[in-house]
């Protein structure tokens, strides 16, 4: 079953969206409760913050080395088998996490899970396979919206289940991952025809080499830096949100589940519906510029918020920020040839994984420095102030890059 005809490509899009939805629901389920689960093995808030950073770091470093390998394998053998491997890996990791008897077991499980988890990168390659260059920004937006819907349903469900038992969300997430495996086996078509596959090379699966190749793509070098800064800010948010809101507002799994529900809802609304309208009136470059400014202001306001309800208000302020990732992905994908989409998106995933490695060190590290301060203290927002700075620097780089590209294009036209 393949998606290498126009009708097949059109029909394949709903299949991959359903796959991503179930995948992200399962991941989203554990977000509100994983820090609390780590806390059951530690004796203080400071230790909990530190070890949650270690658990997140372990997943990220394994994913950094695993993503380009799995991306290159998907260029060789097709997207479908690599996605199925990722679903099986997720199911194993969720069940093993729920049953972990000690902290070192939890760390080991996250290491294996990170090495096998490249579903996001392969899904992006899948969408690139079945889309024309003109369709990619909109379809990456739909993919981002599906991620958002998964994070609507996942965290709020995980928060409610976590109130019953901390381990219950992990069992439910494992069940969803198994369901996704069955869906992939019986329903999901292959998107990469045999004629467009390429041999596997270990050299190209090296994450450092992958990042160099990504920077070498014509016209996207500075955008890689923008993506890196944006990813570091986003993953710092992910790695500190639950701990931060607990320290500042005294929130538990239920409150964090609802707040992450709101983030996912806004992401889905913007990328699933509003982005199509925005692209009719704006270029992806303009959306990147406006989105980075919006994100910088939002991170600053999240860090400054003196009351919990304000966290919800700031989500609305970040409306344009939800368009940045899809816009950047479409520009990078359009710069790569058809036989290299898996490797290119694997390289993007490696970049994201590297930032996911650094985020717990920076976010949890900064939060550890201020965790002794009283609830509601100004300095508890330090990780978010850091994220605002990252987005501001990314905005400056993007503005300069697009201005230079415009000047170069104008000079070429005049010649």
Q: PLM features: residue spans?
A:
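A membrane-interface helix-boundary motif in multi-pass transporters
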Residues: 162-175, 365-391
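Short amphipathic helix-loop junctions that connect adjacent transmembrane helices
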Residues: 32-49, 239-256
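Juxtamembrane intracellular "pre-TM" segments in multi-pass secondary transporters
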Residues: 2-10, 189-226, 248, 415
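Conserved MFS/SLC helix-loop-helix module at the cytosolic interface between two early adjacent transmembrane helices
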Residues: 64-103
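Helix-breaking motifs and short loop linkers at transmembrane-helix boundaries and internal kinks
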Residues: 78, 99-104, 116, 250, ...
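Helix-to-loop junctions at the C-terminal end of transmembrane segments
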Residues: 66-78, 270-284
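C-terminal transmembrane helical hairpin of 12-TM major facilitator-type secondary transporters
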Residues: 285-328
């Amino acid at each position: 079953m393949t998606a290498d005809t126009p009708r097949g490509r059109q029909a394949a899009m709903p299949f991959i969206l359903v796959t991503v939805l179930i995948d992200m629901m399962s991941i989203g389920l554990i977000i509100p409760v994983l820090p609390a689960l780590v806390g059951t093995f530690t004796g203080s808030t400071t230790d909990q913050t530190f070890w949650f950073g270690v658990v997140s770091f372990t997943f990220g470093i394994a994913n950094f080395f695993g993503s380009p390998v799995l991306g290159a394998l998907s260029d060789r053998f097709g997207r479908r088998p690599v996605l199925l491997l990722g679903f099986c890996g997720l199911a194993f990791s969720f069940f093993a996490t729920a049953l972990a008897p000690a902290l070192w077991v939890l760390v080991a499980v996250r290491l294996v899970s990170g090495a096998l988890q490249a579903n996001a990168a392969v899904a992006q390659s899948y969408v690139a396979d079945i889309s024309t260059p003109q369709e990619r920004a909109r379809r990456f937006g739909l993919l981002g919206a599906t991620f958002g819907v998964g994070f609507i349903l996942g965290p709020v469900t995980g928060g409610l289940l976590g109130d019953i038992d901390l381990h219950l969300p992990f069992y439910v997430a494992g069940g969803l991952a198994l369901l996704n495996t069955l869906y992939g086996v019986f329903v999901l078509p292959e998107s990469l025809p045999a004629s467009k596959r390429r041999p596997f090379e270990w050299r190209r699966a090296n994450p450092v080499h992958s990042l160099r190749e990504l920077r070498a793509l014509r016209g996207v070098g500075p955008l890689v830096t923008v993506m890196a800064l944006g990813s570091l800010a986003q993953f710092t948010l992910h790695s500190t949100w639950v701990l931060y809101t607990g320290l500042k507002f005294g929130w538990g799994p239920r409150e964090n589940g609802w707040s992450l529900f709101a983030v996912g809802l806004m992401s889905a609304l913007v990328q699933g519906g509003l982005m199509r309208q925005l692209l009719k009136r704006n270029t992806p470059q303009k959306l990147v510029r406006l989105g980075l400014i919006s994100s910088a202001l939002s991170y600053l306001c999240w860090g400054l918020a003196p009351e919990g309800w304000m966290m919800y208000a700031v989500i609305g302020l970040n409306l344009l920020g939800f368009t940045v990732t899809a816009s950047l992905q479409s520009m990078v994908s359009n710069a790569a040839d058809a036989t290299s989409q898996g490797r290119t998106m694997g390289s993007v995933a490696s970049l994201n994984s590297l930032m996911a490695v650094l985020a717990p060190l920076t976010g949890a590290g900064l939060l550890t420095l201020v965790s002794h301060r009283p609830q509601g203290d100004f300095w508890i927002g330090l990780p978010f102030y850091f994220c605002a700075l990252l987005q501001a620097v990314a905005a400056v780089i993007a503005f300069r890059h697009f201005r230079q590209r415009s000047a170069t294009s104008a000079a070429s036209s005049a010649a």
